Amino acid sequence: MMSKLGVLLIICLLLCPLTAVPQDGDQPADQPAERMQDDISSEHHPFFDPVKRCCKYGWTCWLGCSPCGC
């Protein structure tokens, strides 16, 4: 009985190897460099003032840009 299970296990592993299953390293959360390229930082925000290093208008707080004195 055990030898039949062993043979079945080997056949299953040969047909579907463990490398075909996505590993944890393949997840987007584990790749911070690629995730940072997709993020829109406040420097690229349309209301960002590069001199003051904040947003020009206070009402843009909810748009993802840190406001100037909000």
UniProtKB/Swiss-Prot annotation:
Chief localization: secreted
Record site feature (Important for binding and activity), residues: 57
Signal sequence region: 1-20
Cellular component, GO annotation: extracellular region
Gene Ontology molecular-function annotations: ion channel inhibitor activity; sodium channel regulator activity; toxin activity
Places the protein is found: Secreted
Modification after translation, per record: Contains 3 disulfide bonds. They are not added, since framework IV presents two different connectivities (I-V, II-III, IV-VI and I-III, II-V, IV-VI).
Name of the molecule in the record: Mu-conotoxin PnIVB
